Amino acid sequence: MSAALWALSTPLHAQTRGAWTAGFAGTLGGGWQIEAADIGYVRALRAGPVRVASLTARLGSFVDEGAILGGARGFIFGLTLGGHTGLLSLADLGTETSKSQVGVDLTVEGTAYVGTRSPFPEGSPWGAVTVLPGLKFGDPDGVQFGLLLGPTFFFGQASDVRPFLGVRFEAPLARRESHP
């Protein structure tokens, strides 16, 4: 809550470098998987190949993909710190005044999880490192949509590797109007 108040109380110029992010995060496959919602804050950063840093909260549950009814069990909470490379543009769509960009980037995330009634052998708490190549679409200075898919490495009392799917929306905190 304090972080949200801090972000909203910053001057307009500082807010142009930040954005809100929301989306879906889940592991893929049969058996027990994680399905969660993400909400967080991203900020432009210039640190070598890392162009964007993100801090995200993840809230969800364990879901048995083999169950037809009643497959949810327990809850998870995760705190994720991520670094994103710059967008490698593949195509520009639209006009000069209303353009959209399609591109790829790479995201590396570290997540600390706690959970209740975990069916995973990692126990609770546990950690994860995720490497996510992603496809992004949208206004470079506005709302963007991203689809990320890659491996996540769980570690705790045991280790495991699972496929990870992320669907993300980003919206800037403030937008400067273009001047003629």
Predicted segments, located by residue:
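Generic structural motif
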Residues: 16-22, 56-57, 104-108, 145-149
